[in-house]
Amino acid sequence: MNQTFSFNFDDTLSNSSGLINLEKINQNCSPNYQYFKIKFIGGYLHIKNKSGDILEKYDLKDLISLIALKKDYLKLSSPNNKKPNEFTNIKNKHLENRFNLYVINEDINGKITKNGILEEIILNRLLLSILLGNEENLLQIA
């Protein structure tokens, strides 16, 4: 089963918002980890300079990523004070990676990373920024 969430990411040099579809997938790589496929339904990633001017704009529609995190996240309680179905980052806040979340592949279908490693780094940062601190939202995915 999968579920759709909105996401919002904003920091000094980039911002992004849109919709993602999260699907729990069965991988037997490690029994201690849960794997998720993330498909961007819509949204853009903007790269900005220090003045806030947009230097580059990436269409995220149909981009597919794969992540993993320790199953310890299942011990979390469901969100009660956050807007449901939304992944947001907190600007300039250090986020702890409590469940060893990592991005296995930023762009499975090579939609925007075909140009080089810079796009991979930016996507990795985007994914970690919207997921870290929002792990309880993953409890909603059966």
Swiss-Prot record:
GO MF, one annotated term: lipid binding
Cell cycle as UniProt keyword: no
Keywords from the named record: Lipid-binding, Virulence
Similarity annotation: Belongs to the TULIP P47 family.
Function comment: Part of a botulinum neurotoxin type A2 (BoNT) locus; may be part of a progenitor toxin complex required to protect BoNT during its passage through the host gastrointestinal tract. Binds phosphatidylinositol (3,4) bisphosphate, phosphatidylethanolamine and phosphatidylserine.
Quaternary state and interactors: OrfX1 was not detected as part of a crude toxin extract that includes BoNTA2/NTNH, P47, OrfX2 and OrfX3.
Protein name: Protein OrfX1
Origin species: Clostridium botulinum (strain Kyoto / Type A2)
Native organism taxonomy: Bacteria, Bacillati, Bacillota, Clostridia, Eubacteriales
Gene: orfX1
